[in-house]
């Protein structure tokens, strides 16, 4: 589950500016 979210964040970090 975490890998899926990390992959999405790397592809579209704009979606999760939490980082």
Curated annotation (Swiss-Prot):
Its EC number is 4.1.1.4. The keyword Hydrolase does not apply. It comes from the Bacteria. Keywords: Decarboxylase, Lyase. The keyword Transport does not apply. GO terms for molecular function: acetoacetate decarboxylase activity. It catalyses: acetoacetate + H(+) = acetone + CO2. Belongs to the ADC family. Catalyzes the conversion of acetoacetate to acetone and carbon dioxide. This is Acetoacetate decarboxylase. It comes from Clostridium pasteurianum. The gene is adc.
